[in-house]
């Protein structure tokens, strides 16, 4: 099969203006399998990211990944477990799978971070079995940046743990706060607990227990409970919840945002007068679309491991995978793993290593 051509990178000078340059050259292991648009789209994203100073180890079917540039090394790994029903069993049974080999490269020190746009369950399983949890971490967690214009909100967990205990959510709060400090430069991010009411007495027993523990944590800027409608109102910088609730909330917001853009487009073309107004409003509407588009966020951080991971959306195009790789690179340069561990250690929220089993985390496919 002839090698495919790589698309020319678009001009991103305006979009990337003001972003912090990558301080060193991190190496990112990227799983090219599992994306809805195929490995070629991931390869294009890797090419765009490499042009911004990142080295990439690209794991996938070499025949579909094209001619790699000087900063990209293609590792032929055509086997995918992204669609397998049991991610944990598949990750153990298929060590040659692309996601497993990418995670192993991170564990062995060949790469600094992992990026995948395939199955969440497969990426979690491969990461837990190879990269492993950081010392004292009970459960890894997925932290997504909710694309609120001008003020991204870190939502954690968004799918790694469908069932949790109070101590898990306490650790998630500290991990999310450390991430917000590094990524957004917030010296003391406001942390809130997602619940069915703002009062301290509202919520499940787990939420009540977590509220009490976070209120007593002087190291944390805990601002209390927050309801779902307030996620985008700027009341908190970090919102903590279990993976089931967080995943549902995130996907509802993504769906509503997408539908609103579609309705605006349809309305702007509905009449001659609307078309004139649409032309005048087009620059502003495009700016809003770009601000809230999931691809701009770049995916979710996988926190609590010995190395950082970023899980992109399977529907991402090249632009989204580029952002996912750049997210991972900036997390490496910002030492998110070290900052998270230090924050938990200072707060006394780490468990002794002997009390943490390697198989204690819930792995859920999505």
Tell what function each PLM region has.
Residues 40-41, 53, 57-63, 67, ...:
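Glycine-rich phosphate/diphosphate-binding loop of Rossmann-like nucleotide-binding domains
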Residues 112, 118-168, 172, 178:
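Glycine/threonine-rich beta-strand-loop-alpha-helix active-site module
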Residues 128-155, 235-239, 243-360, 366:
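Glycine-rich phosphate/nucleotide-binding loop
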Residues 2-64:
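N-terminal phosphate-binding or glycine-rich loops at protein starts, especially the Walker A/P-loop
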Residues 28-40, 91, 160-170, 311-318:
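Short, glycine-rich nucleotide/cofactor-binding loops
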Residues 31, 59-60, 75, 116-118, ...:
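Short beta-strand segments
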Residues 70-111:
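Phosphate/nucleotide-donor binding subsite
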